[in-house]
Structures are given as C-alpha cells and as structure tokens.
C-alpha cells in the first residue's frame, strides 16, 4: 500500500523508505517555532537538559506576537526572558517588535518554511504551513525544548482523510467558508490525529491566502495537520518569498485514506460558526437576526493582504454602524505597509474602523478588543470557545472577512451580497 503526502514527508525525515499509520518514528526537524507565551516554558525545560547550545541557530524561530506590543508588566517580562535567551543562544530568527507579525503570517512571508519541510511549533495553529506543502503541527513547550536541543522529535504517523474539492466557489465564498463548512460537516473531532489532505480541481480557484486559512483551521477539526499539494501557485509563492531549496512530495496513487470526502465548492454559501464550538455552523441564509457589538478582522487565520482588501472593498465609502466597534489587525508589518501603500488603511479608517499593529490580541482574549459580559463579536479568528475573547458570558461568531465587514455596516450578522 502506498503513502499519503504527509506520510512521504515524514518517512523522508525519518530516513525510512516507508511508514504506515500508527507507526512511531523519530524525525529530523527543519524548523522549531515558539512565541511569547509558550517559549518561556520551553526555555525552563531546555535548561534542565544540561546543554549549552541549540541544535541550529538558523532553524529556530521565536515570534513574540500574542501580547505584542507588551500589554502589561508580565508580558514585558516574558518577552525580555525570551529575548535574553535568544541573544545568548545566537538564535537568528527572533523577531523584535519592529519586525512584528503574527507568527503564522510572518514565517511564510520571511521564507522560513518551504515545501517538504517538517515544522513543529509550540502553538496549535502551526498546521498553517501545510498550505506550502510542508508537514507542520503544534506541539507542547516540552517538545519545543527537546526540538531546540536535538533538532528531532517523535511522531505517531497519522492516517488521513482526503478532501476532493470540486468546481469554482461563488463570489463571497472563501477559504474560510470552505473550512468552516468542512468542520461543521465532520465535527471538531472528525479528523482527530489525522492528516487532512486537500486535492481536486477546486484548488485552481483557491489563492495561497485561502489555503493558509484552511490549513490553519485543520486543528479545529482535530487534525494533526492540513496539507495541500504543491502546484504552480505554491511555487510562485515560494519563489517570491524564499531562497531556500524545497522538495515536492506527492501522495501515491494507491495511498490509503480513512475516508474520502467530495465537496462541490459551487454549492457552498458563506458560513458562520456559532458559539461555542467551530463545528456549530450555519450558512448565512440561516443565521437569523443577531445583533452584534464588535467585529474583528485579522489573526493568523485571516489577517493577510487579500483579507484586508476584501474588508476595504465592502467598507469603502460607507460607515461602520454607530455603536459597533470594528477592529482590523494586519498580520505582519509588511502586510500593514502594503495596506498603507494601497490606500486600504485610509479607506478603513474613514469608514470608522480602528487599525491595530500586528498582534494576536483579541483572538485569545489578550488585548486590543476584549469582550464584556453579554457582548457578541463577529470575528475572522479560529476559535469561539466559552470566554475565548473575553468574558465567559460573551459570544464569538466565526466568519470570513466579507461577512465580518458586512456585519460591521449593519450591526447584525449579514450576507455580504446585501451591502
């Protein structure tokens, strides 16, 4: 029996001719990632190993992003601790505030991840890089520490679900709507410890930003990773952003999948995830009359330039409804700069939007837009658990940038076709 795309990458990095689902293997790592929340714990564990250097100074990336710029004294102390460790170890990819960005937007932009890589990150949405044809997955701080010390980690080889995406999606149906539809269909544990492998002619209509969004939310279906085949769009992106060499892995024709699911993209509608789980989805036609207090457009899921362009296209020349707070957060400094150069920021501010520096911020209830008791938010983020963005009695509705921007104009969850 052949191997899936994920299994081929893992086999190569384990120095094995083949692997099979359930097999325990030790693999060599191309990149180890941490942020301002998880890295301090990893450093504490690293110090217990009795080693005085990291395995490779250029293959570790540390991105303060959750509470950046420092939101309080504790956040400042955390980043200081991480900064001092990075300087002592000579870690080349520590991203200071001037280079700031949400880690999963920043690393592809910096060319640190390429097709065929194995990447671990002490952040659950590390699965984002599957959009580039890499195997990437979230791990805990202890595994991050071991990875920094040895350049290796262990995995149980995952089985896979193949998603065959067919046809062209409608105008307002984006990668966010597709992945919300999938999560709603299979559930938050529907791909538990499985590789979600996306194929089909529908990929021709999905931009790299769409793919980043979809791979990013694989974890919300329980997936070990989400991954896309390398095609012309992938290669174009890699050529633009990196000087590293990459390797393309393809699933075998006789690869075994636990399930094969076909999705007709042309039948999908904009989709909203209701509180308090990402799989509690409804199409925009079935959301009902729901008043909101806040809109957030950003995050590692939807903070890229195409997301900001969509928001601008809907909001330009109009006004955010009085009493509604609309917060836009570019994913990186470069995205922010590009949005400035394209006039997007000007158009958004004139529409009544507040624009933040790049940060995870409100997504995890950190800062820059926390919800009070009883408040509702339409957000382009990736999780809507109880208390995720603030008070435990607040509500988060996950949606695309188009739905979020349209909702900011009306004060209700709104179909972008109607504005």
UniProtKB/Swiss-Prot annotation:
Binds 1 [4Fe-4S] cluster per subunit. Pfam families: Aconitase (PF00330). Its EC number is 4.2.1.33. This is 3-isopropylmalate dehydratase large subunit. GO terms for biological process: L-leucine biosynthetic process. Heterodimer of LeuC and LeuD. It is an enzyme of class 4 (lyase). It catalyses: (2R,3S)-3-isopropylmalate = (2S)-2-isopropylmalate. It comes from Clostridium botulinum (strain Eklund 17B / Type B). [4Fe-4S] cluster binds at residues 300, 360, 363. One of its GO terms (molecular function) is metal ion binding. Catalyzes the isomerization between 2-isopropylmalate and 3-isopropylmalate, via the formation of 2-isopropylmaleate. Keywords: 4Fe-4S, Amino-acid biosynthesis, Branched-chain amino acid biosynthesis, Iron, Iron-sulfur, Leucine biosynthesis, Lyase, Metal-binding. Its cofactor is [4Fe-4S] cluster. Pathway: Amino-acid biosynthesis; L-leucine biosynthesis; L-leucine from 3-methyl-2-oxobutanoate: step 2/4. Belongs to the aconitase/IPM isomerase family. LeuC type 2 subfamily. InterPro entries: Acnase/IPM_dHydase_lsu_aba_1/3 (IPR015931), Acoase/IPM_deHydtase_lsu_aba (IPR001030), Aconitase_4Fe-4S_BS (IPR018136), Aconitase_4Fe-4S_dom (IPR036008), HAcnase/IPMdehydase_lsu_prok (IPR011826), Homoacnase/IPMdehydase_lsu (IPR006251), IPM_dehydratase_rel_enz (IPR050067), IPMI_cat (IPR033941).
């Amino acid at each position: 029996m052949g191997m899936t795309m994920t299994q081929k990458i893992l086999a190569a990095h384990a120095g094995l001719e083949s692997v099979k689902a359930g097999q325990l293997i030790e693999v060599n790592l191309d990149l180890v990632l941490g942020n301002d929340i998880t890295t301090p714990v990893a450093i504490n564990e690293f110090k217990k190993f009795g080693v005085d250097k990291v395995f490779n100074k250029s293959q570790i990336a540390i991105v303060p992003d959750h509470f950046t710029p420092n939101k309080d004294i504790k956040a400042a102390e955390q980043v200081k601790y991480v900064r001092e460790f990075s300087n002592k170890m000579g870690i080349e990819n520590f991203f200071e505030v001037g280079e700031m960005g949400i880690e999963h937007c920043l690393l592809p932009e910096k060319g640190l991840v390429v097709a065929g890589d194995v990447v671990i990150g002490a952040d659950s949405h590390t699965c984002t890089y599957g959009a580039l044809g890499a195997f990437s997955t979230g791990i805990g701080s202890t595994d991050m520490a071991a990875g920094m010390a040895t350049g290796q980690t262990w995995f149980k080889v995952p089985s896979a679900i193949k998603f065959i995406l067919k046809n062209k999606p409608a105008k307002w149906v984006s990668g966010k709507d597709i992945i919300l539809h999938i999560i709603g269909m299979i559930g938050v544990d529907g791909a538990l410890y499985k590789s979600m492998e996306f194929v089909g002619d529908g990929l021709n209509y999905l931009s790299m930003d769409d793919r980043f969004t979809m791979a990013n939310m694989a974890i919300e279906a329980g997936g070990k990773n989400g991954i896309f085949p390398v095609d012309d769009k992938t290669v174009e992106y890699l050529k633009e952003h990196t000087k590293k060499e990459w390797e393309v892995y393809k699933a075998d024709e006789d690869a075994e999948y636990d399930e094969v699911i076909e999705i007709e993209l042309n039948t999908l509608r904009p989709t909203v995830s209701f509180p308090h789980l990402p799989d509690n989805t409804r199409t925009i036609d079935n959301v009902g009359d729901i008043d909101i207090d806040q809109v957030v457009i950003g995050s590692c899921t939807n903070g890229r330039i195409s997301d900001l362009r969509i928001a601008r296209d809907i909001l330009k020349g109009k006004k955010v409804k009085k009493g509604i707070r609309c917060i836009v957060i570019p994913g990186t400094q470069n995205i922010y700069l590009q949005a400035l150069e394209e006039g997007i920021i000007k158009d958004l501010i004139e529409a009544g939007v507040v624009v933040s520096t790049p940060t995870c911020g409100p997504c995890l209830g950190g800062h820059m837009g926390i919800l009070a008791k009883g408040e509702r938010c339409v957000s382009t983020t990736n999780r809507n658990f109880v208390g995720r963005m603030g008070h435990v009695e607040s509500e988060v509705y996950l949606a695309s940038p188009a739905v979020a921007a349209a909702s900011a104009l009306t004060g209700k969850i709104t179909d972008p076709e109607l504005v």
